[in-house]
Amino acid sequence: MRRVDKPWGYEIVWAETARYVGKVLHIQAGHRLSRQYHKVKEETLMVQDGEMDLEIGPAESVEIRRMKKGDVFHVLPGTIHRMIAVTDVDVLEVSTPELDDVVRLEDVYGRQGTNAP
């Protein structure tokens, strides 16, 4: 198990194999992840505690889904998305193992660009 500090909070990687990865993302209230998509990575998100808004789709037609404890969303490759913490929130993420597959479209912390395989 390892902890990775992020500008929006931290993540704990609790499982990492050649076939899947399990993480807990702790996002501090008022913080947001980058607007991003993945070319290959597929992930399922479940809110463990707290509330967040999940933005889905391109900026000109974004859907905002309020997610609370127990809510689940499946993110397919190519889906533009961003998590925004309404309160401190813990999100369980289970995904395919392509952790560096991130295409950032917008980032308030200055991490613009692509980390795609």
Residue ranges of predicted features:
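A short glycine-rich, His/Asp/Glu-containing loop-to-beta-strand
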Residues: M1-K41
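Double-stranded beta-helix
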Residues: R2-K6, I84-P117
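Short, surface-exposed secondary-structure edge patches
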Residues: V24, T44, I64-R65
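Histidine-centered metal-chelating micro-motifs
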Residues: R32-S34, H38, D71-R82
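Short hydrophobic/aromatic-rich beta-strand segments that constitute the beta-sheet cores
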Residues: S34, L54-I56, E93
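Short glycine/proline-enriched turns and hinge-like loops at secondary-structure junctions
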Residues: Y37-K39, M46-V47, R66, A85-T87
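Glycine- and acidic-residue-biased ligand/ion/polar-headgroup-sensing regions
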Residues: V40-P58
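Short acidic-glycine-tyrosine-enriched beta hairpin
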Residues: P58-G78
